[in-house]
Structure formats: C-alpha cells, structure tokens
Amino acid sequence: QKACTMDYFPVCCQIVLGGGAYTAGNPCSCQGFVASKGTCDNPYPCPCTTEAQFPVCCTTQWGLVSATGNCACGCMGGVPVSDGPCPEVY
C-alpha cells in the first residue's frame, strides 16, 4: 500500500506498460507507475492521475499498445479496444 499525497509536484509517470513515460502529478505515484522524479523528456503533461490505473489495450498510430488506463490511452491519441493488456504479438 503506497502512501498517497495529493500534491502535484511533477513526477515522470510510466503510463504505458513496458515503456512510454509522461509527466504527471504525484497521485500517479500512488499507482506505482513512476519512472523517475521530475518531468519526463516528453514535453506534454498527462492529466491521467485521477483514474484507476488498470491496463487497457489501446489502438494507436503505432499499433496496439498496452496502456495503464483509458486516460493514458487517450493521452497518446489512442482508443481503448479492450480491458487488460494487449495480447502478445507473435
């Protein structure tokens, strides 16, 4: 159980399972998706810190990507296609 604070110091938040980080507020860290302190290299803040961070399979311009929530999916310009991580590609 992580301690949750509602301050909004930026953290680098991994919103894509296995990679892809976006700058987000501290509530992100409650969900365990923090890559590092401070802002990410990605210049765009992602307001995806208030929803439950359940994996979704998201269709994006890069193909199917497993994201940590519908908001994270939308943050990449994607559309959720199913709950849970995307199936492995063979």
Swiss-Prot record:
Gene Ontology molecular function terms on file: carbohydrate binding
Cysteine-cysteine disulfides: 46-71
Top-level taxon of origin: Eukaryota
Protein keywords: Disulfide bond, Hemagglutinin, Lectin, Pyrrolidone carboxylic acid
Post-translational modification: The N-terminus is blocked.
Modified residues (Pyrrolidone carboxylic acid): 1
Primary role: Lectin with specificity for complex N-linked glycans and O-linked glycans. Has hemagglutinating activity towards rabbit erythrocytes that is inhibited by N-acetyl-D-galactosamine.
Protein name per Swiss-Prot or TrEMBL: Lectin-1
